[in-house]
């Protein structure tokens, strides 16, 4: 079997109208990741509807429609291969969904591609673009590439490209602590295919990489195998003749059969008999592996979704209270002391109370602008103290980043996002 390419999770971010989904579609289409049979079917339909010459946008619309109708399209649709990587695209259609996904780590991205419309040079950087980039920074995404898109609408002008590049560099990237000299700015026209996978003949002045080549310049993620074991539990099954089988994704550390494990905040422990991935037994599980593991000495009723598995010598931290840095994404009024929304951290969902508002920060620079603010509103960044209403595991983001991030939800929407920067552990 050929050695598998390393997986790279790439988030596509930017304003909704910058052509993100077209860029993603073009990447998938030109790198042959869309199922050929589906393409044939769509081509035929395009011809029947008099759209001969096979409109790319038509394919994208149909993929979108198929998604909306709930028809599962070949999963290849969200993955494609470059020379170096198997790339998984974390493309988030809805702005708020995107933010929640990015923060809860469900789709912890290794790198991001910021897609902007070259025409924004005239109007200024879109607020949503700023917010996405700030979040990418807050979440520790260090590697980014920029696609300056819709170049076809400015006649592939180098001057317009340079204007946009300068504006992004000075007003956004440098402010957030990125070094523009280490970032590829690729002039693209996704609808036409320029510089996404295929090199454009319309911009001979551009000598840099295509978007796909820029992805290959990213560094692969280090697997956090040296950190303590943490497996947030997604489900627990009781299988006849086998016993209790918790299921989850290994976030950090290594799990092997024979290991003694402890589940928190449940406070129960047992011994691992076997580990399965994709219905095959494996000798050890590493970060990124979605596994089921059979545990002796634990019953199904002892543990549940939201518990975290670790080794007894370094068990998951159950928080009495914690200090967090948050960004308020949307709140109809204001957040004050006593507010108790639901925190989504790894697989846990626990109501937590704001017990102190310590500092208000400038969301663009992180500088303190007010000590002990009375309230927080949409757009504010802050440092706050939080008390869970019932036991939950959360880790200091500086020690185990994979379990240090969370989203805050209330009234059916994501109110805020953040990370734990100090955790006071519960005394046993």
UniProtKB/Swiss-Prot annotation:
PANTHER family: TRANSLATION FACTOR (PTHR23115). Residues 189-191 are annotated as: G5. SUPFAM superfamilies: EF-Tu/eEF-1alpha/eIF2-gamma C-terminal domain, P-loop containing nucleoside triphosphate hydrolases, Translation proteins. Residues 14-21 are annotated as: G1. Keywords: Cytoplasm, Elongation factor, GTP-binding, Hydrolase, Magnesium, Metal-binding, Nucleotide-binding, Protein biosynthesis. It holds the Pfam family GTP_EFTU_D2. Belongs to the TRAFAC class translation factor GTPase superfamily. Classic translation factor GTPase family. EF-Tu/EF-1A subfamily. Residues 149-152 are annotated as: G4. Signal peptide: none annotated. HAMAP family: EF_Tu_A. GTP binds at residues 14-21, 91-95, 149-152. Residues 70-74 are annotated as: G2. The keyword Repressor does not apply. Residues 5-225 form the tr-type G domain. It is found in: Cytoplasm. The keyword Transmembrane does not apply. PROSITE patterns: G_TR_1 (PS00301), G_TR_2 (PS51722). Its EC number is 3.6.5.3. One of its GO terms (cellular component) is cytoplasm. This is Elongation factor 1-alpha. Mg(2+) binds at residue 21. The gene is tuf. GO terms for molecular function: GTP binding; GTPase activity; translation elongation factor activity. It catalyses: GTP + H2O = GDP + phosphate + H(+). GTP hydrolase that promotes the GTP-dependent binding of aminoacyl-tRNA to the A-site of ribosomes during protein biosynthesis. Residues 91-94 are annotated as: G3.
